[in-house]
């Protein structure tokens, strides 16, 4: 909906009018929307100039069609811009990073679409995509019109949209939620990344439930340290909409699970918490059985009840994912028996423990998104549970990202695999050979990888050719991705396709 500039300034007193073209009346200015991408702006929009834009502020403001510009109060930057910019621009200022206000403004301009939706947001280092996809399947099977927002894209109705982000920017996110509401969606399962939470992309979103999977090392190129990373994840529980039947779900036994549990309890003592394997043992997992046909376990329920859970999803980590999904389903009112039945036939989640067999099924490959030390360890151990005669782990590490995890992942691969192949992930602007050098520092003295090949396609072919009968090649790091970033170029690349070609499947 359109709004007068004066009305917006009254609604958001933290925004001040810095510069206004002479001859115009502020009350005559109508605002349609707010965008942080200058290319998406229209004349009556606000261009939100995020701090992260850095030195390109002038360039992006010049290219923006928006007549209103919102940026952080900084007299030097503002005065410099006012001297060189077209005087027809209206400059607004605030004391904080404008990106922190963007979500609240976007939600307000669209009539708060999230208020009419049950939004379940999942955060954690690993498991977000799997868990949201499992929840989407469980709810859909019970006739709920639901939507999905995450790493693999946005899904609702017959629509699938690739946003390129785990958590879209605040303006895009609110537009997506508005479309979902208009399409009759009632429940949304979304991934809440630490980047998205710290940058305020979910500010202004009405979240009913927050789910936490785990917290292990990742993104230390973005977060100053693990405590900053933890606090960014905790932010999800600070933005819960307590006007709804709000609740939290977490894995108490997961890394940083107990820490989060007690912090939530201290800050929000009245918040309902479903804690898997908590200190009161209300939701305890036992009798786990793992094989290539599926996974089963017993989930303890309050009142000394138990429920046998069986699922086609593979790997010990999917024990935790499905159990967390079950608890979340209880929170949103799903039928227990129907959930149990649905878990037996969850659709394959792209790039998550995705098995590809050779034509004669004598060898296999597993494609998985694991790109953190914890995720790599979990997937290798899960593949080990299938007892392959030989396990070769192929992986690399992303360029321009947290470098400290590189030797740690090498150590894990060496200790848990029979052979290791080093290759490129998304090298971005780093030299691929330099990345591999840094990974190799984590190997023990004298350990030599089976192969070191920066060309990922060639590495996969070589890995498949080295597999003995009964062997398995784990291709870790990219999972569902259908691209590879080399330099600043994004090229088509799919681990699944490369494995299929190497097996001669097409």
Curated annotation (Swiss-Prot):
Meso-2,6-diaminopimelate binds at residues 401, 425-428, 477, 481. InterPro entries: Mur-like_cat_sf, Mur_ligase_C, Mur_ligase_C_dom_sf, Mur_ligase_cen, UDP-N-AcMur-Glu-dNH2Pim_ligase. The modification N6-carboxylysine is found at residue 233. UDP-N-acetyl-alpha-D-muramoyl-L-alanyl-D-glutamate binds at residues 38, 166-167, 193, 201. ATP binds at residues 124-130. Its EC number is 6.3.2.13. It comes from the Bacteria. This is UDP-N-acetylmuramoyl-L-alanyl-D-glutamate--2,6-diaminopimelate ligase.
């Amino acid at each position: 909906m359109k709004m007068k500039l004066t009305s917006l300034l009254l609604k958001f007193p933290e925004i001040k009018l810095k510069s206004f073209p002479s001859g115009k009346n502020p009350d005559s200015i109508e605002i349609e929307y707010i965008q942080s991408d200058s290319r998406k702006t229209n004349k009556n929009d606000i261009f939100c100039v995020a701090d992260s834009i850095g030195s390109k502020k002038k360039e992006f403001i010049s290219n923006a069609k928006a007549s209103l510009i919102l940026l952080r109060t900084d007299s030097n930057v503002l005065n410099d811009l006012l001297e060189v910019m077209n005087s027809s621009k209206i400059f607004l200022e605030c004391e904080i990073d404008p990106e922190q206000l963007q979500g609240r403004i976007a939600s307000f301009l669209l009539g708060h679409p999230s208020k009419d939706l049950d939004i379940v947001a999942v955060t954690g280092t690993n498991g977000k995509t799997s868990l949201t996809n499992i929840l989407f399947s469980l709810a859909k099977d019970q006739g709920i019109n639901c939507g999905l927002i995450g790493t693999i894209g946005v899904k609702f109705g017959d629509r699938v949209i690739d946003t390129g982000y785990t958590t879209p920017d605040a303006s895009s996110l609110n537009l997506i939620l508005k479309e979902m509401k208009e399409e009759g969606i009632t429940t949304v399962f979304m991934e809440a990344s630490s980047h998205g939470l710290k940058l305020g992309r979910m500010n202004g979103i009405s979240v009913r439930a927050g789910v936490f999977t785990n917290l292990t090392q990742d993104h230390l190129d973005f977060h100053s340290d693990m405590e900053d990373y933890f606090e960014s994840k905790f932010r999800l529980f600070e933005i819960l909409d307590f006007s709804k039947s709000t609740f939290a779900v977490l894995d108490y036994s997961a890394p940083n699970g107990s820490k989060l549990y007690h912090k939530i309890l201290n800050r929000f003592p009245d918040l309902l918490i479903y804690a898997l394997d908590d200190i009161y043992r209300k939701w305890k997992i036992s009798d786990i059985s793992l094989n290539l046909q599926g996974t089963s376990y017993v989930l303890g329920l309050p009142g000394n009840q138990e429920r046998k859970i069986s699922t086609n999803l593979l790997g010990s980590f999917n024990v935790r994912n499905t159990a967390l999904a079950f608890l979340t389903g209880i929170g949103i009112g799903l039928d227990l028996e129907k959930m149990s039945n649905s878990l037996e036939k969850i659709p394959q989640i792209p790039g998550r423990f995705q098995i590809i067999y050779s034509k004669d099924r004598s060898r296999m490959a597993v494609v998985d998104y694991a790109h953190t030390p914890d995720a790599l360890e979990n997937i290798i151990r899960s593949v080990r549970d299938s007892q392959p005669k030989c396990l070769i782990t192929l992986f690399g590490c992303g360029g321009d990202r947290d470098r400290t995890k590189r030797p740690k992942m090498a150590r894990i691969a060496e200790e848990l695999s029979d052979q290791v192949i080093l290759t490129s992930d998304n090298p971005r602007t780093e030299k691929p050979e330099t990345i591999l050098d840094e990974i190799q520092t984590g190997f023990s003295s004298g350990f030599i990888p089976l192969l070191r090949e920066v060309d990922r396609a060639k590495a996969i072919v070589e890995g498949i050719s080295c597999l003995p009968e009964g062997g398995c090649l784990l291709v870790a790091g990219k999972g569902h991705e259908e691209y590879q970033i080399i330099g600043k170029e994004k090229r088509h690349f799919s681990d699944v396709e490369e494995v299929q070609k190497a097996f001669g499947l097409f």
